[in-house]
Amino acid sequence: MADVFEFELEGHESQASPQRHAYHYDNCTEIMEDDHMYSNVADGQISAPPPSSSYMEDPMMESIQLCASAINPPNVRVGPEDFQLLKVLGKGGYGKVFQVRKTTGSDNGQIFAMKVLQKATIVRNQKDTAHTKAERNILEAVKSPFICDLLYAFQTGGKLYLILEYLSGGELFMHLEREGMFMENVAKFYLSEIVVSLEHLHQQGIIYRDLKPENILLDAYGHVKLTDFGLCKEEIEGDQKTHTFCGTIEYMAPEILMRCGHGKAVDWWSLGALMFDMLTGGPPFTAENRRKTIDKILKGRLTLPAYLSNEARDLIKKLLKRHVDTRLGAGLSDAEEIKSHAFFKTTDWNLVYARQLEAPFKPNIENDEDTSLFDARFTKMTPVDSPCETNFSLNGDNPFVGFTYVAPSVLEMMNKGGHGGISVAHLASSMSRAGAAKSPRKPGDPETASILHGGHSNLFGHGPNSEAPQAFGYGIGSQMTTTTAGGAGIQQPYQSFSGGYPEDDAMDTSTPRASESRETTTGNGSTTTTRPSNVGSSASTPIPLPKRVM
């Protein structure tokens, strides 16, 4: 697939205040009691509270039994031995993604996706280590029906484990590969749910920065779930800008390429590129190599096929405005500008938020273990969690102290299963930072901000010495790399274009472009794979369905 980059530009974010991360979890359980009612305060005679037996006899008081099973309910702490490997969903330099079945606890028998990461590979780079911990924090903090959910996180001496919900609908990329392109009503469904998911991230002060078909998964009902938060930027308020050079080239906004600072509006450019991709068969700007692709993004004319509706053409043109100030969604109202566009005039946004719109494609799943919508190149592999050559102490200098996590939803399930009367909220606060993560973040509060959104990572990228093919949907995919074709490293982000932007007006045409190529870069170098460009046709001409090549 396409190249993904991340560069921290000196002189900008390097001057930001250092972030502190709360990775230590208390092992105690806090029990809150109501204030006692005291009498005779006026004359200085304060009666002692009644003995505890009096409370137990009061039918209005709730009994709380303190016992080992209540404070430390069984099966809260999990490990690799609690999961049965079923299938390989993906593989990369940092590790593998498996389909697994839980074999213990109240969720015994449930199917999950298990991402296994090699510590030795991650700790080679201090930044990778920090990003990995921050990525896990984002997965914990951001809860939305349109975001892939994290259920457990744990570690061994040599590996990190993330247990995510299994999304049997596969990647949107695979469906586009099969169909070639989508009809407008189909694209509208997916775009509406993507808009809502980006809106949620923006409201949390997060820029996504890597929207593309590979990072969009479908659940068993055909609804959208975003995954891969490795390129996110947190703590962005209002029109605040950041200066990291990152993203997947074909979907990157011009202001990222120009290194002039960017904000949340880069996600709306990517939405426009994705919309174009869905409706035409490929991204709007592609070429035979990376440099020419960037040149087209910065200076090329946008070519729109004639078969698109006026509303679709107008929305694409307004999203792909090179001048940020004129781009739809760049204002303070953010997603509201896009939701009110004529392309979505028939969309009931209340139904979108409630996930009550009927999906155009409902996966034909035989059972919970069905992996037919994932790449057979992976699922035919024998699932083996390979042994580690290097192990790290789980105490002392362990760089991943505090990585363990159990979702509140899991604790709630266990509580209903009869593990005592301790409040689930107390259990959650003792096992993780879930309580703090759900608290409103106050602008300008660095400690709270770091708890909520600890940073960005390349946790979901493939690491060095990775093997092709790569998995995309669950994130062991394209690495943020500085490797170019032939292995030459990029020392600086693209900077050859020094002039102003060309006109933003798109050129409508019915002339299809020739197929162009996208580069796929791995840690060992890069290869080039061909993907179709936008396909144009007249309204009376049958629309060819191009075949995507992965």
Curated annotation (Swiss-Prot):
Residues annotated to bind ATP: L89, G90, K91, G92, G93, Y94, G95, K96, V97, K115
Keyword set, alphabetical order: ATP-binding, Cell projection, Kinase, Magnesium, Metal-binding, Nucleotide-binding, Phosphoprotein, Serine/threonine-protein kinase, Transferase
Resulting phenotype, T404A: Abolishes phosphorylation and causes a decrease in the number of germline progenitors
A Pfam family hit: Pkinase_C
Domain of life: Eukaryota
GO CC terms, sorted: axon; cytoplasm; nucleoplasm; perikaryon
Listed SUPFAM superfamilies: Protein kinase-like (PK-like)
Catalysed conversion reaction: L-seryl-[protein] + ATP = O-phospho-L-seryl-[protein] + ADP + H(+); L-threonyl-[protein] + ATP = O-phospho-L-threonyl-[protein] + ADP + H(+)
Residue ranges crossing the lipid bilayer per the database entry: none
InterPro entries: AGC-kinase_C (IPR000961), Kinase-like_dom_sf (IPR011009), Pkinase_C (IPR017892), Prot_kinase_dom (IPR000719), Protein_kinase_ATP_BS (IPR017441), Ribosomal_S6_kinase (IPR016238), Ser/Thr_kinase_AS (IPR008271)
Annotated effect of mutating S439D: Phosphomimetic mutant which inhibits axon regrowth following axotomy of PLM neurons
Sequence segments annotated as region (Disordered): 433-466, 484-550
Chief place of localization: other
A Gene Ontology BP annotation from the UniProt entry: nematode larval development
Localisation: Cell projection, Axon; Perikaryon
Region forming the signal peptide: none
Disruption phenotype: RNAi-mediated knockdown causes an increased lifespan and resistance to starvation, slower growth and a decrease in brood size. Causes a decrease in the number of germline progenitors. RNAi-mediated knockdown in adults causes increase in lgg-1 positive autophagic vesicles. RNAi-mediated knockdown in a daf-2 e1370 mutant background results in daf-16-mediated up-regulation of stdh-1 reporter expression in the intestine and a synergistic increase in lifespan.
Annotated GO MF terms: ATP binding; metal ion binding; protein serine kinase activity; protein serine/threonine kinase activity
AGC-kinase C-terminal domain boundaries: 345-415
Biased composition (Low complexity): 520-534
Listed result of changing K115Q: Probable loss of kinase activity. Enhanced axonal regrowth following axotomy of PLM neurons
Modified residues (Phosphoserine): S439
Family: Belongs to the protein kinase superfamily. AGC Ser/Thr protein kinase family. S6 kinase subfamily.
Function: Serine/threonine-protein kinase which regulates mRNA translation. Negatively regulates lifespan and resistance to starvation, oxidative stress, protein aggregation and P.aeruginosa-mediated infection. May regulate these processes by preventing the activation of transcription factor hif-1. Required, probably downstream of let-363/TOR, for the establishment of the proper number of germline progenitors by promoting cell cycle progression and preventing differentiation during larval development. Regulates germ cell size. In addition required for sperm production and embryo viability.
Stated name of the protein: Ribosomal protein S6 kinase beta
Gene: rsks-1
